[in-house]
């Protein structure tokens, strides 16, 4: 949000920094709900909200369903944090017309993220997808709220014209998709300590990521058997994850995903060069795009 504001020529840096808390709270709200959907127990090397309250439920309310208690509390807390994010934006003190426009845009971002979540869940349960469907899901689920949405909100609060808003999208969408591809790679090949969550959780949940669908396209019979035995298996062993990784490498799915993410980053950076924005914002957006695919495995 901060650099979207600067990109559009905004000058009140202190105010936009305070206001940027709003998008962080919206981010947390979405992640809390995402953890419930994905049944994740760990994030940022800490218990997820649903996991934390499930443990409380087991300890205090032995006659009741602890998982339901944990998930219910997480939904409530997520909703409350989302409302706080909206309130901070509403009370930000920018031009009223810009605040109204930004709040409207924020609801658009949340709506598309929810659509992306539903696409992710549907594809997971269906057990198959093509590349176009997966990339469209990545755009809705991730690119909208991680990159495009914050840039738009900041630019809108600075009074940016619609032309600049649209130009920022040309940068944000490919970079946001590349971010999700790298996230998928880290989810299988990354360090659990650095990742802050369980490596292999996407495999256990049966996520139909770009890596999975490309591996399916090129796998032989034995490799297909390994993929099918691991995906959706809640009792994965380290040896199972190692075998899964081996298939992803041998089918060149990893190489394909890395190549596509690099291509998307180049696309986003090239778009950034096509329109005039403030130098500080341009330098940051250029650097953060590179960082998206350099996050450590």
Predicted segments with their positions:
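All-alpha prenyltransferase/terpene-synthase fold signal
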Residues: 1-297
